[in-house]
């Protein structure tokens, strides 16, 4: 690309403070207004050069800087805090301090808000300091090291050892990596072109080569590599050309122009512009490497998901096509499939046109019961708005819907309001019934305790036997009523709960066919016949207690228990008994019972189980008394029993049909531990002809050969104890040895895993007397064995029978001899309770021990992990300390080696200089001795001795006394020769031509400096630099006597002493550069020096509004 290069400003005329201020203000305005078209006109050209080349700041820019609006808006965008937009300088300074950036100016002074607000005079240093702080915050925000490494990793490989340490190092790392990639591409086509790398970001940026190569990598068409000037020894013109390429590219090919410099700002780069360079490179990085937004990752679904063989995706325009088809087709012309029935039923599901996105796309077959159940559940809880809308379409037609008048919405709202009202009524009824249930439960408890109190006062044997036998019969009735729920859902739920006990239902059985129910009305009539018969002892007993309970009768009549509460104990699972046939106690009720049994063969709703006494008390189902009749005779019909069933052998009744002596049926947890007097044993009746069992009788399981093993399941025993309100009763009898009752025998109960681990015995055995001695119980208590007792046991009892035979073979038999105590004993299962308590205690101890062991183990593991972590950290710290010590030791050794080399170099150079002087003195003179070299110490000794021995002559100056006469100390005679000081004028002249002022652009400055040096008669010249980067500031001469440098040209102090100098340089004419020398004293080997920062005077730019500036 060929374009004319404008004239550059001479280096002595360039003012870095003006360039810094202009670049900083431009960056601040561009940060606030990212697009140039949004920038106000007064701020767009707020900083310009006048005709004389001086910068001028517009009053609008000064006002915006002093009121803090520009700073606040820039800080709001950098820190992403919108609240800062309306704040002032104080808020910006506070947020910068919180961010860890101190705003300092003039050394180490903090910038105050008053300095920024003041406009006359305009405090330029304070404003530059806050702009630099904002640049630093912007750099930290957009140039994190990880982001730069990630961006470079997308182009080339990055080694872990190459990762930068800070943001500035990251920018240098990014530029060098891209330059290496460009070099690889260019070398394939042209091997003569050499793409350089940047060793120092600020020194190597002036030639513009690396930045142009960077632009070529990202925009090869806008910045061709052939247009870039690559030259190892680049001249000032080459640097200016590359920088103008960079400026034009940023102005025309980038969305936001980040180049806010003048060409001289980068060509004569000063330290004050380093932060501006950082901000410029950061903006380039953001535009070339924008942040990558990660694509959203779909979170995997947790839990069961519907099985889909094809992905479910919406069919485009599916609903629109259906709507168009419906609108275009008239009702009378529609096919039958489009004509919905006029009467919409609740059981009809939603239309197929309604979106079913929540359902599976692959329909599968379902059982009819599930479909019916789901339909019945949905019809009361789902409002089908589609069917409502279709109903209105049929009535008013499609045309009315097109002319929408709000009737459809009003109808939908009315339907919803009606549904909400019904729901509120149901919730109110449920709340009221729940409250009534609690109240009735408390009253039922009170009635029960009152009845128990009266029962405990009566100790006669007949009453107890009467209660006992009546309770046994009601237990059998309870078993039938417990299965009287009737509905499929309730029955299936109970069957599932019963099937969870292995002793009740065995695997492989089809148990629903074996279950039968008892009509509830017949049971209620039989129960009522116990109480209302005029000849029962119960009526006689109740008449005696009538007077004592008259006051409580009115109150107790309102304390009836609800049927739902009375069924709580019935709904706790299947009771493990064989099937029973309930007998009618009185022949007068036989015909009525027979009619009820024939009418109610199907499923009947559950009725309350229990009866009411004449006093008004309610007798629960498990505590109702049975009246005992001794002489009542009734002749049954031939071949028929008292319950209307075919007559079979009834071991519990005599020929007259009267009930035998009182018996007790073990239902939940009452042991069969009763005896009957021998004089009350009924005579053995001849066996009658066995008839087929009644198919309407209740069967819990399929038939079994052995019906003597009757046992309840353990969970049901515990539940029955809990429903007895904690009340047990017992009649004393002589002590006897009773083996422990076996609670269960299949050893398949569920235990805690801690018990299985810590307990030696996996299953506790508790022996039951009724299980170990079934034949004895059948012989002693024939009235307890009901009809078909042996035909209704589950086949899974074979295992229990085998265990019972084993127990009988070991001699665990109960004493069947009668005792003197009449009646029977009601045991509260103390032995079983103690065993269960013992087992529970052992479980608690085992759980506690396991918990403690687990806690200790966990604690030990944590301590072990902590120790391992501390050990690893200690080892890592030790390795790091060793590395630091090794690096420090290497550094010290390196410094010592360098110092040793420097001292050796100085010694050799001094000897060489002294030898040259001696050879010059002895030129042209013959002598017998060869020339020898004296050291500096010998020369000083000779000088001192000559001063002491030789007296001062008149007219001789003190300066002449300082000249050493080495010949006086010589053993031979030599001629006197005055020492000639060596001059570095030629070296300084070479440095000015090739190092300090290279190129044609600096001819005028170079010639003027050389002319001033030629006019001086001094022998040794020194060049003043700004810092270690060897930026020219002035030319000085060295006074050897006073060790003072005196200025003859350029900038800087008039005189400089050694105390003012911080570094000294020596010029290498071959390499054409200056080298820093580690010394603090001036000597003949020094060619340049730099002074401390506090001795530099900063030029003040006059305010644009001051009269002095206007005069210029």
UniProtKB/Swiss-Prot annotation:
<dbReference type="InterPro" id="IPR014797">
    <property type="entry name" value="CKK_domain"/>
</dbReference>
<keyword id="KW-0472">Membrane</keyword>
<dbReference type="GO" id="GO:0043204">
    <property type="term" value="C:perikaryon"/>
</dbReference>
<protein>
    <recommendedName>
        <fullName>Patronin (microtubule-binding protein) homolog</fullName>
    </recommendedName>
</protein>
<feature type="region of interest" description="Disordered">
    <location>
        <begin position="324"/>
        <end position="358"/>
    </location>
</feature>
<dbReference type="GO" id="GO:0002119">
    <property type="term" value="P:nematode larval development"/>
</dbReference>
<feature type="compositionally biased region" description="Polar residues">
    <location>
        <begin position="935"/>
        <end position="951"/>
    </location>
</feature>
<dbReference type="InterPro" id="IPR022613">
    <property type="entry name" value="CAMSAP-like_CH_dom"/>
</dbReference>
<feature type="region of interest" description="Disordered">
    <location>
        <begin position="485"/>
        <end position="504"/>
    </location>
</feature>
<feature type="compositionally biased region" description="Low complexity">
    <location>
        <begin position="542"/>
        <end position="557"/>
    </location>
</feature>
<feature type="coiled-coil region">
    <location>
        <begin position="850"/>
        <end position="914"/>
    </location>
</feature>
<dbReference type="InterPro" id="IPR036872">
    <property type="entry name" value="CH_dom_sf"/>
</dbReference>
<comment type="subunit">
    <text>Interacts with dapk-1.</text>
</comment>
<dbReference type="InterPro" id="IPR038209">
    <property type="entry name" value="CKK_dom_sf"/>
</dbReference>
<dbReference type="GO" id="GO:0031122">
    <property type="term" value="P:cytoplasmic microtubule organization"/>
</dbReference>
<feature type="region of interest" description="Disordered">
    <location>
        <begin position="916"/>
        <end position="965"/>
    </location>
</feature>
<feature type="domain" description="CKK">
    <location>
        <begin position="972"/>
        <end position="1109"/>
    </location>
</feature>
<dbReference type="GO" id="GO:0005516">
    <property type="term" value="F:calmodulin binding"/>
</dbReference>
<feature type="compositionally biased region" description="Polar residues">
    <location>
        <begin position="345"/>
        <end position="358"/>
    </location>
</feature>
<feature type="domain" description="Calponin-homology (CH)">
    <location>
        <begin position="165"/>
        <end position="286"/>
    </location>
</feature>
<comment type="similarity">
    <text>Belongs to the CAMSAP1 family.</text>
</comment>
<dbReference type="GO" id="GO:0036449">
    <property type="term" value="C:microtubule minus-end"/>
</dbReference>
<keyword id="KW-1003">Cell membrane</keyword>
<keyword id="KW-0963">Cytoplasm</keyword>
<dbReference type="Pfam" id="PF11971">
    <property type="entry name" value="CAMSAP_CH"/>
</dbReference>
<keyword id="KW-0206">Cytoskeleton</keyword>
<dbReference type="InterPro" id="IPR032940">
    <property type="entry name" value="CAMSAP"/>
</dbReference>
<dbReference type="GO" id="GO:0030425">
    <property type="term" value="C:dendrite"/>
</dbReference>
<comment type="function">
    <text>Required for microtubule stability and anchorage by binding to the minus ends of microtubules. Acts redundantly with noca-1 to control circumferential microtubule assembly along the body which is necessary for larval development, viability, morphology and integrity of the epidermis. Promotes microtubule stability and polymerization in neurons. Involved in the maintenance of neurite morphology in ALM and PLM neurons. May play a role in synaptic protein localization in the PLM neuron. May act upstream of dlk-1 in neuronal regeneration.</text>
</comment>
<dbReference type="InterPro" id="IPR001715">
    <property type="entry name" value="CH_dom"/>
</dbReference>
<keyword id="KW-0966">Cell projection</keyword>
<dbReference type="GO" id="GO:0005829">
    <property type="term" value="C:cytosol"/>
</dbReference>
<dbReference type="GO" id="GO:0007026">
    <property type="term" value="P:negative regulation of microtubule depolymerization"/>
</dbReference>
<dbReference type="Pfam" id="PF08683">
    <property type="entry name" value="CAMSAP_CKK"/>
</dbReference>
<dbReference type="GO" id="GO:0051011">
    <property type="term" value="F:microtubule minus-end binding"/>
</dbReference>
<feature type="compositionally biased region" description="Polar residues">
    <location>
        <begin position="489"/>
        <end position="504"/>
    </location>
</feature>
<feature type="compositionally biased region" description="Basic and acidic residues">
    <location>
        <begin position="802"/>
        <end position="816"/>
    </location>
</feature>
<feature type="region of interest" description="Disordered">
    <location>
        <begin position="788"/>
        <end position="834"/>
    </location>
</feature>
<keyword id="KW-0175">Coiled coil</keyword>
<keyword id="KW-0493">Microtubule</keyword>
<dbReference type="GO" id="GO:0030424">
    <property type="term" value="C:axon"/>
</dbReference>
<dbReference type="GO" id="GO:0042383">
    <property type="term" value="C:sarcolemma"/>
</dbReference>
């Amino acid at each position: 690309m060929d374009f004319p290069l404008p004239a550059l400003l001479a280096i002595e005329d360039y003012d870095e403070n003006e360039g810094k201020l202009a670049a900083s203000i431009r960056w601040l305005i561009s940060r606030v207004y990212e697009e140039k078209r949004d920038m106000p006109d007064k701020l767009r050209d707020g900083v310009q050069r006048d005709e004389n080349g001086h910068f001028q700041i517009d009053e609008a820019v000064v006002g915006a800087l002093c009121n803090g609006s520009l700073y606040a808006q820039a800080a709001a965008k950098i820190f992403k805090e919108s609240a800062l937009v309306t704040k002032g300088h104080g808020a910006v300074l506070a947020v910068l301090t919180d961010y860890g950036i101190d705003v300092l100016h003039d050394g180490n002074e903090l910038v105050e808000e008053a300095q920024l607000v003041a406009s006359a005079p305009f405090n330029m240093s304070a404003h530059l300091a806050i702009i630099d702080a904002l640049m630093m915050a912007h750099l930290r925000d957009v140039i994190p090291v990880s982001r730069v490494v990630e961006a470079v990793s997308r182009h080339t490989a990055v080694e872990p050892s190459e990762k930068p340490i800070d943001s500035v190092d990251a920018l240098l790392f990014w530029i060098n990596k891209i330059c290496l990639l460009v070099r690889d591409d260019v070398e394939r086509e042209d091997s003569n072109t050499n793409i350089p790398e940047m060793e120092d970001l600020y020194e190597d940026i002036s030639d513009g080569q690396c930045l142009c190569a960077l632009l070529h990598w990202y925009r090869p068409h806008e910045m061709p590599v052939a247009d870039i000037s690559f030259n190892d020894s680049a001249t000032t013109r080459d640097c200016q050309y590359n920088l103008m390429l960079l400026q034009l590219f940023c102005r025309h090919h980038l969305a936001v122009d980040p180049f806010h410099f003048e060409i001289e700002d980068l060509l004569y780069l000063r330290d004050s512009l380093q932060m501006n360079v950082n901000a410029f490179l950061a903006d380039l990085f953001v535009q070339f490497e924008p942040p990558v937004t990660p694509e959203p990752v779909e979170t995997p679904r947790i839990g069961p998901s519907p099985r889909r063989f094809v992905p479910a995706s919406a069919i485009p325009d599916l609903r629109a096509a259906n709507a168009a088809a419906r609108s275009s087709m008239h009702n009378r012309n529609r096919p039958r499939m489009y004509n919905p029935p006029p009467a919409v039923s609740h059981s009809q599901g939603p239309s197929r046109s309604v979106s079913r996105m929540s359902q599976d796309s692959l329909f599968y077959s379902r059982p009819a019961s599930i479909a019916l159940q789901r339909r019945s559940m949905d019809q009361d809880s789902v409002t089908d708005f589609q069917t409502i809308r279709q109903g209105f379409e049929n009535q008013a037609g499609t045309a009315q819907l097109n002319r929408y008048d709000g009737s459809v919405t009003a109808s939908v709202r009315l339907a919803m309001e009606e549904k909400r009202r019904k729901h509120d009524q149901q919730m109110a009824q449920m709340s009221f019934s729940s409250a009534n249930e609690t109240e009735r439960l408390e009253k039922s408890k009170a009635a029960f305790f009152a009845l128990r109190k009266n029962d405990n006062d009566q100790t006669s044997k007949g009453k107890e036997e009467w209660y006992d036998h009546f309770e046994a019969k009601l237990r059998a009735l309870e078993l039938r009523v417990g299965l009287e729920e009737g509905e499929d859902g309730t029955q299936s739920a109970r069957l599932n709960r019963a099937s969870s006990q292995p002793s009740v239902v065995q695997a492989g059985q089809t148990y629903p066919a074996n279950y039968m129910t008892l009509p509830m009305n017949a049971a209620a009539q039989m129960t009522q016949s116990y109480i209302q018969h005029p000849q029962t002892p119960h009526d006689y007993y109740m008449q005696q207690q009538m007077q004592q309970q008259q006051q409580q009768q009115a109150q107790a009549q309102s304390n009836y228990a609800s049927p739902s509460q009375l069924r709580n104990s019935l709904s706790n699972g299947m009771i493990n008994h064989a099937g029973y046939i309930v007998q009618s106690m009185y022949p007068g009720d036989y015909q009525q019972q027979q009619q009820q049994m024939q009418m109610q063969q199907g499923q009947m709703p559950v009725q309350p189980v229990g009866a009411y006494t004449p006093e008004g008390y309610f007798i629960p189902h498990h505590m109702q008394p049975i009246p005992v009749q001794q002489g009542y005779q009734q002749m049954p019909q031939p071949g028929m029993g008292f319950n209307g069933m075919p007559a079979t052998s009834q071991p519990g009744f005599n020929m007259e049909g009267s009930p035998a002596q009182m018996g007790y049926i073990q239902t939940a947890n009452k042991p069969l531990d009763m005896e009957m007097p021998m004089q009350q044993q009924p005579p053995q009746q001849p066996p009658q002809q066995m008839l087929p069992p009644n198919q309407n009788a209740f069967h819990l399981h399929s038939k079994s050969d052995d019906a003597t093993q009757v046992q309840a399941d353990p969970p049901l025993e515990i539940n029955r104890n809990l429903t007895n309100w904690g009340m047990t009763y017992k009649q004393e009898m002589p002590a006897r040895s009773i083996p422990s009752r076996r609670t269960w025998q299949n050893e398949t109960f569920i235990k805690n895993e801690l018990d299985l681990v810590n307990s030696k015995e996996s299953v506790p055995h508790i022996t039951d007397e009724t299980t170990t001695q079934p034949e004895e119980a059948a012989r002693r208590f024939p009235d307890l064995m009901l009809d078909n007792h042996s035909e209704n046991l589950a086949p899974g009892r074979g295992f229990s029978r085998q265990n019972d035979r084993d127990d009988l073979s070991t001699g665990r038999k109960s004493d069947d001899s009668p005792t003197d105590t009449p009646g029977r004993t009601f045991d509260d299962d103390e032995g079983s309770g103690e065993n269960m308590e013992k087992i529970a205690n052992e479980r608690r101890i085992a759980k506690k021990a396991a918990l403690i062991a687990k806690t200790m183990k966990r604690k030990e593991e944590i301590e072990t992990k902590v120790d391992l972590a501390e050990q690893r950290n200690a080892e890592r710290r030790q390795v790091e300390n060793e590395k630091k010590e090794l690096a420090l030791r290497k550094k010290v050794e390196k410094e010592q080696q360098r110092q040793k080399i420097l001292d050796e170099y100085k010694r050799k150079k001094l000897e060489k200089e002294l030898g040259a002087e001696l050879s010059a003195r002895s030129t042209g003179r013959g002598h017998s001795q060869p020339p020898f070299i004296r050291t500096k110490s010998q020369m000083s000794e000779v000088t001192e001795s000559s001063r002491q021995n030789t007296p001062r002559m008149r007219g001789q100056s003190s300066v002449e006394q300082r000249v050493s006469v080495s010949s006086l100390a010589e053993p031979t005679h030599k001629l006197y020769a005055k020492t000639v000081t060596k001059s570095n004028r030629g070296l300084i002249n070479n440095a000015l031509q090739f190092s300090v002022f290279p190129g044609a652009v600096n001819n005028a400055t170079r010639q003027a400096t050389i002319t001033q040096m030629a006019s001086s008669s001094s022998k040794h010249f020194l060049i003043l630099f700004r810092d270690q980067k060897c930026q020219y500031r002035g030319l000085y001469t060295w006074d050897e006597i006073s060790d003072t440098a005196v200025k003859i040209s350029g900038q800087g102090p008039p005189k400089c002493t050694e105390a003012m100098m911080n570094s000294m340089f020596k010029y290498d004419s071959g390499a054409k550069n200056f080298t820093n020398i580690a010394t603090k004293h001036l000597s003949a080997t020094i060619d340049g020096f730099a002074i401390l920062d506090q001795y530099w005077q900063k030029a003040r730019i006059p305010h644009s509004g001051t009269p002095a500036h206007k005069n210029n």
